[in-house]
């Protein structure tokens, strides 16, 4: 039986009072009225787009001039972004809006190297910026025919609950497998390549029915709230070499699709099940987060599965819309996503150069946008041990359904490279303004690209990982390093297995992966359970019916292992999860007898599976 780690986060609650404008709550002690002046960089006579790629505003804070530089967050949305809501009679309505001309920006303050900004410019400037180490909020004042904005320090927002909030970590029988510590030394070439690769999290957000009611049954208001939150999350993860893109948004505008309740662990379990059985069938994504207007029991404001990324059920989290200040909700969501990505709560010794950090167990009223050294170590260990594959997959050019956007780090149709904005790009091979290769460059990235040129034909670009793999070489005509491997069916691991698609699957290794380093394969008698045709033993499924193994096929069904641990001396053990029944089956290509290997639940001649 596997254990699941449910990780909760608790924080002070700011009750919603009917408006998204913080000033109207009466919780701001002191603010300054400013009149931001836009400084245009467009040449005279040029056509000005609704929302420019870069903008600059000037205003005064504490009597001192401030210049705010903004760049559009071009990676905010994926190219196949979709939105779903429901009609009063329950009909699903899905649209694919064009979102490249959006109004969400990141930025900095001129002459302040430590400054940051996350701003919505949809109707005036709304968001936060960091100036000389202090956090400020800015939002338009609701005055007729006026460009007046309010600027106030975050510390001047009165907190309605100053009591410390503790975070709880619970364990439940039906949960994701615990994080296993990995050695930081002696990485295999495959692990090192994985660590160096860019990571992409394709995020899907869901707003429940209470959120819809909370924002006045206004789809635009709910949508704006979600956009504001993701605009804060993306730069937090960009520092970790993780690109977060919003692939979809769903608003439960007629009724909830699950029973959202104050018990956070029950709600998370229901949401994970709904994602696995419903949402994933409609929309491909890597991680889903539910934003709810309900109050969870106790101080809990969020909950997530530790290490669940890429799992059909456990790559999920739930977050309470606990504050009028959207960046506090965004940090809570970034925290829950951090748990999905293998990060545990920070200890007292953890540091990020400021306090607190994103993965603090109890979020104080001091906002932080940095991961601690402990979080970075947790994440690295998780990646090394598990190597989740979904976050390596960036959108394919052929999947793009809206116009390409230069500067979003995704190479799309019509682009030769994409290294981000002109300010952030550090790629000497790529012209960030056009997303084309610079003059004389043949490539910008790839294992067969070196200093903007193709490596010579025959140059080794990837070493053989094991005896079933082959060293890969460059062609001299491409930046790609095509993967190749030894012929299938070739004996491997001292004749204990046969090569299968570049790997050598044997039962002994599979038992160790499931039950730990001391595990061994069970005796032959245990495999006779596979003749029963139930969840304890079967060979394959047909139309969701478990088919019992024939006598000669029993070693191609469920894998039986002996954990050989102090707490488990049972000689016949299976790995079983009701939400992922196929995990724990003998892998395809595994040797089941001399000259035979498993294929579709049958022990067949070794040449047949290939």
Swiss-Prot record:
It is an enzyme of class 3 (hydrolase). It comes from the Eukaryota. A motif (D/ECD-tripeptide) lies at residues 467-469. The keyword Cytoplasm does not apply. GO terms for cellular component: extracellular region; plasma membrane. Pfam families: ADAM_CR (PF08516), Disintegrin (PF00200), Pep_M12B_propep (PF01562), Reprolysin (PF01421). Residues 21-189 form a propeptide. Residues 199-395 form the Peptidase M12B domain. GO terms for molecular function: metal ion binding; metalloendopeptidase activity; toxin activity. GO terms for biological process: proteolysis. Its main location: secreted. Residues 403-488 form the Disintegrin domain. PROSITE patterns: ADAM_MEPRO, DISINTEGRIN_1, DISINTEGRIN_2, ZINC_PROTEASE. This is Zinc metalloproteinase-disintegrin-like 4a.
């Amino acid at each position: 039986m596997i254990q699941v780690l449910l990780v909760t986060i608790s924080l002070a609650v700011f009750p919603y009072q009917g408006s998204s404008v913080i000033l109207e709550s009466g919780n701001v002690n002191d603010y300054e009225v400013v009149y931001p002046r836009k400084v245009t960089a467009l040449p005279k006579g040029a056509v000005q787009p609704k929302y420019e790629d870069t903008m600059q505003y000037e205003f005064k804070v504490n009597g001192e001039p401030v210049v705010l530089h903004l760049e559009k967050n071009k990676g905010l949305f994926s190219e196949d972004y979709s939105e779903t809501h429901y009609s009063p009679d329950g009909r699903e309505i899905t649209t694919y809006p064009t979102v490249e001309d959006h109004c969400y920006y990141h930025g900095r303050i001129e002459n302040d190297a430590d400054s940051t900004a996350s701003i919505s410019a949809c109707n005036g400037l709304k968001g936060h910026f960091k100036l000389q180490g202090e956090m400020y909020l800015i939002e338009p004042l609701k005055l007729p025919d006026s460009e007046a904005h309010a600027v106030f320090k975050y510390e001047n927002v009165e907190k309605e609950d100053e009591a410390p909030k503790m975070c709880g970590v619970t364990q439940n029988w039906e949960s994701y497998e615990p994080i296993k510590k990995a050695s930081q030394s002696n990485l295999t070439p495959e692990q090192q390549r994985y660590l160096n690769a860019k990571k992409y999290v394709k995020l899907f957000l869901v707003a429940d029915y209470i959120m819809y009611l909370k924002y006045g049954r206004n789809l635009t208001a709910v949508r704006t709230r979600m956009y504001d939150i993701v605009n804060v999350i993306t730069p937090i993860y960009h520092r970790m070499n993780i690109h977060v893109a919003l692939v979809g948004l769903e608003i439960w505008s007629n009724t909830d699709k699950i029973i959202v309740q104050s018990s956070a662990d029950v709600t998370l379990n229901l949401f994970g099940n709904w994602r696995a059985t419903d949402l994933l069938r409609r929309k491909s994504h890597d991680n889903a987060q539910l934003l709810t207007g309900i109050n969870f029991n106790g101080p809990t404001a969020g909950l997530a599965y530790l290490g669940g990324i890429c799992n059909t059920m456990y790559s999920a989290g739930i977050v309470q819309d606990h504050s009028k200040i959207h960046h506090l909700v965004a940090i809570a969501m970034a925290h829950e996503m951090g748990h999905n990505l293998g990060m545990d709560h920070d200890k007292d010794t953890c540091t990020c150069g400021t306090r607190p950090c994103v993965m603090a167990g109890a979020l104080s009223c001091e906002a932080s946008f940095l991961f601690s050294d402990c979080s970075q170590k947790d994440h690295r260990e998780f990646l090394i041990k598990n190597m989740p594959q979904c976050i390596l997959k960036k959108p394919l050019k052929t999947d793009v359904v809206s116009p390409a956007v230069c500067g979003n780090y995704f190479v799309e149709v019509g682009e030769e490279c994409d290294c981000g904005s002109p300010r952030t790009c550090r790629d000497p091979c790529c012209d960030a303004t056009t997303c084309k290769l610079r003059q004389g460059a043949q490539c910008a990235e790839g294992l067969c690209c070196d200093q903007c040129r193709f490596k010579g034909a025959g140059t080794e670009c990837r070493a053989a990982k094991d005896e079933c793999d082959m060293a890969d070489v460059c062609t001299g005509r491409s930046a790609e390093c095509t993967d190749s491997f030894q012929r299938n069916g070739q004996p491997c691991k001292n004749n204990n297995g046969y090569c299968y698609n570049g790997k050598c699957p044997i039962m002994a290794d599979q038992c160790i992966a499931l039950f730990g380093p001391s595990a061994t394969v069970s005796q032959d008698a245990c495999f006779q359970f596979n003749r029963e045709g139930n969840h304890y033993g079967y060979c394959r499924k047909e139309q969701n019916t478990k088919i019992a193994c024939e006598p000669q096929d029993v070693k191609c069904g469920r894998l039986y292992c002996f954990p050989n641990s102090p707490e488990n001396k049972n000689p016949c053990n299976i790995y079983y999860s009701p939400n992922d029944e196929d995990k724990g089956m003998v892998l395809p290509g595994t040797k089941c007898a001399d000259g035979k290997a498993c294929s579709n639940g049958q022990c067949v001649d070794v040449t047949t599976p290939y």
